[in-house]
From Swiss-Prot:
UniProt xrefs under Pfam families: Oxidored_nitro (PF00148), PCP_red (PF08369)
A GO term for molecular function: 4 iron, 4 sulfur cluster binding
Places the protein is found: Plastid, Chloroplast
Upper lineage: Eukaryota, Rhodophyta, Bangiophyceae, Bangiales, Bangiaceae
Primary localization class, coarse: plastid
Listed GO CC annotations: chloroplast
InterPro entries, A to Z: ChlB/BchB/BchZ, LI-POR_suB-like_C, Nase/OxRdtase_comp1, P-CP_red_C, Protochl_reductB, Protochlorophyllide_Rdtase
Source organism (scientific name): Pyropia yezoensis
TM region(s), chain numbering: none
Protein name: Light-independent protochlorophyllide reductase subunit B
Its biological purpose: Component of the dark-operative protochlorophyllide reductase (DPOR) that uses Mg-ATP and reduced ferredoxin to reduce ring D of protochlorophyllide (Pchlide) to form chlorophyllide a (Chlide). This reaction is light-independent. The NB-protein (ChlN-ChlB) is the catalytic component of the complex.
CDD domains, A to Z: Pchlide_reductase_B
Subunit structure: Protochlorophyllide reductase is composed of three subunits; ChlL, ChlN and ChlB. Forms a heterotetramer of two ChlB and two ChlN subunits.
C-alpha cells in the first residue's frame, strides 16, 4: 500500500459505485467509515444529472466496531428496499472496511430473505484492483447474475433481430465526455442502419439485461469498461464484439470496416465505403484541416501524451498519423493493460511510459520540455506550473470536462473536437509575446528541472530585466535552462554573469 495525495485511478469501491449509479433502479450500500463516503459529493458535483446519487453509506463507527456490522448493514439494505423499491441492491465494502474481514456474503444472504429486490455483494478484491478494473468486474457480475437468473427461468431472448443490431457496453457515470460520445455513437449507428438494442449500464434497467443476446454484436468503445462483459457474452451466447475505438479519422474508418466485415459474416450485405469517404471528405472538418497551412505549422512540434489506455493510445495515433506532430513519449496509468498499450503505440512515439506515479510523470514532462501536453487534470496542473499548454484528453478530470455543450471525442464529430483541442493547445507564433506587449497577460512562474524540485532560486533585478527582454514564446525555456545551470553549479542567485555562462554552456 502506498500513501499518495493524488491517484489517477481511484480505489476499487469507486468503480463499483460508478456502475451501480449508472443503472436505473439500482441502489448501492457502501460499508465504509466516514471519509470513504465522498462518492455522493463527487458525483453530485461533476455529473450533469438531476437525480440524487443512489448510494447510501453504512457507516463503520465505534458502535459497529464494538458490536459487529451485521445488524446495521442488514437494516440499511432492508430500509432502502422499502424506501426506494430498487430492482437491485449492491453491497460494497471499501479497502478500509475490508480490514475488518467480515463475512459480508452472509449479510447479503440474510438481507435478501427480507427484501423484494435482488441483493448482491460486489465481487472485487479491494487490495488488488483499482477503480477501472473494479468497474469492469462489477458490470460483468451484474450482467452474469441476471443472465443466469433469466436462463434458469427460461426468459433469455436469444432470437436475433431481423436487421443488424448492436449493444453498446461501457456508458458509465463520471466517464470522460461519456454522454456526448454515446450520443455520437447513436448517430453513427443510425447512419449505418444498425439498430441499437441496449446501451449499458447508463440509464439501463437490470430487468432488460436478458435482451442483450438479441443483438447481432456488442460494441465496446472504451477498453476500461465493458471488455469482461463482452467476453462473457461471447463465451455464453456466441456474440461477437468490436472493440476498436472510433477516435480520429483513421480509427473511425477502421472501426466501421470492422463492423461491416462482422455484419456481412452474419448474413447482411452492407458496404460502408461510400459512407466513410463522404464523411471523411465532406462532414469531418479535420481531414482537410490536417492538410491546411494552419495545421502544417504544427508539423514536427514536440508533444507528450498521458492518460487512460483508450484515450492515450488514440490521441497518440491522431497526433502522429493525422497531424504530423512528434510524440516524444506517451504513457498510461493503466498498468494492468501495459501489453496492449505498448502494442498500440510503440510505432507512433519515441518512448512508452507505464506508471501511476504523478511525480515521475511531472519530472519527465519537465525534462522533455514539450511544446504541448495532452493528459489528465494532473498534467494540466503540471503544465500550468511549467508554463506549458495542456489539452485534457482523459480522466481523471474536473468540472470543466463535464461540459454542457456537445463535445464528443468519438465518431466524425469527435474528430473536429480533437482537431480544435490539439490546435488550440499549442502556443501560436508570438502569441505570448504580443499579449505581454499589449497587456492583459499574466506571466506564470515556471519550475526549472523537475516538478518535484522544492528549493528556490532567486533572480537579481538586472537578470530579471534581461529575461523580460526575451520574447515570451522562448522565455520559459531560457529560464528553465538558466535555473538548471545555476542549480548544477550550486548558485542560489542568478545574475547577468550566470545568465551568460548558462547561455554559453547550452550553446556549446
Amino acid at each position: 500500500m502506498k500513501l499518495a495525495y493524488w491517484m489517477y485511478a481511484g480505489p476499487a469501491h469507486i468503480g463499483t459505485l460508478r456502475i451501480a449509479s449508472s443503472f436505473k433502479k439500482v441502489h448501492a450500500i457502501m460499508h465504509a467509515p466516514l471519509g470513504d463516503d465522498y462518492f455522493n459529493v463527487m458525483r453530485s458535483m461533476l455529473e450533469r444529472d438531476r437525480d440524487f446519487t443512489p448510494v447510501t453509506a453504512s457507516v463503520v463507527d465505534r458502535h459497529v466496531l464494538a458490536r459487529g456490522s451485521q445488524e446495521k448493514v442488514v437494516e440499511n439494505i432492508t430500509r432502502k428496499d422499502r424506501e426506494e423499491s430498487p430492482d437491485l441492491v449492491i453491497l460494497t465494502p471499501t479497502c478500509t472496511s475490508s480490514i475488518l474481514q467480515e463475512d459480508l456474503q452472509n449479510f447479503v444472504s440474510r438481507a435478501s430473505i427480507e427484501t423484494e429486490a435482488d441483493v448482491l455483494l460486489a465481487d472485487v478484491n479491494h487490495y488488488r484492483v483499482n477503480e477501472l478494473q473494479a468497474g469492469d468486474r462489477t458490470l460483468e457480475q451484474i450482467v452474469t447474475f441476471y443472465m443466469e437468473k433469466a436462463k434458469s427461468n427460461n426468459q433469455v431472448l436469444t432470437q436475433k433481430t431481423k436487421t443488424p443490431s448492436v449493444n453498446i457496453i461501457g456508458a458509465v457515470s463520471l466517464g470522460f465526455h461519456n454522454q456526448h460520445d454515446i450520443a455520437e455513437l447513436k448517430r453513427l449507428f443510425q447512419d449505418l442502419d444498425i439498430q441499437i438494442n441496449q446501451i449499458i449500464p447508463e440509464n439501463a434497467s437490470v430487468q432488460d439485461l436478458k435482451k442483450l443476446p438479441s443483438a447481432w454484436f456488442n460494441f465496446i468503445p472504451y477498453r476500461e469498461t465493458g471488455l469482461m462483459t463482452a467476453r462473457y457474452l461471447e463465451k455464453e451466447f456466441n456474440m461477437p464484439y468490436v472493440d476498436i475505438t472510433p477516435m480520429g479519422i483513421v480509427q473511425t474508418a477502421a472501426c466501421i470496416r470492422s463492423i461491416q466485415q462482422l455484419v456481412n459474416a452474419l448474413g447482411a450485405a452492407v458496404d460502408y465505403e461510400k459512407y466513410i469517404d463522404e464523411q471523411t471528405r465532406f462532414i469531418s472538418q479535420s481531414a482537410w484541416f490536417s492538410r491546411s497551412i494552419d495545421c502544417q505549422n504544427l508539423t514536427g512540434k514536440k508533444a507528450i501524451v498521458f492518460g487512460d489506455a483508450t484515450h492515450a493510445a488514440a490521441i497518440t495515433r491522431i497526433l502522429h498519423q493525422e497531424m504530423g506532430i512528434h510524440v516524444a513519449w506517451c504513457g498510461t496509468y493503466c498498468k494492468y493493460d501495459e501489453e496492449w498499450f505498448k502494442d498500440q503505440v510503440q510505432e507512433f512515439c519515441d518512448e512508452v511510459i507505464v506508471s501511476d506515479d504523478h511525480g515521475l510523470i511531472g519530472d519527465l514532462i519537465a525534462k522533455t520540455e514539450p511544446a504541448a501536453i495532452f493528459g489528465t487534470q494532473m498534467e494540466r496542473h503540471i503544465g500550468k506550473r511549467l508554463n506549458i499548454p495542456c489539452g485534457v484528453i482523459s480522466s481523471p478530470v474536473h468540472i470543466q470536462n463535464f461540459p454542457l455543450s456537445y463535445r464528443p471525442f468519438l465518431g466524425y464529430e469527435g474528430t473536429n473536437q480533437i482537431a480544435d483541442l490539439v490546435y488550440n493547445s499549442f502556443t501560436l507564433g508570438m502569441e505570448d509575446h504580443l499579449l505581454e506587449i499589449f497587456g492583459g497577460h499574466d506571466t506564470t512562474e515556471a519550475l526549472s528541472i523537475g516538478i518535484s524540485a522544492v528549493d528556490s532560486i532567486n533572480w537579481s533585478e538586472e537578470a530579471q530585466k534581461e529575461l523580460n527582454k526575451i520574447p515570451g514564446f522562448v522565455r520559459g525555456k531560457v529560464k528553465r535552462n538558466t535555473e538548471k545551470f545555476a542549480r548544477d553549479c550550486s548558485k542560489n542567485l542568478i545574475t547577468l554573469e550566470v545568465m551568460y555562462e548558462a547561455k554559453e554552456k547550452v550553446s556549446s
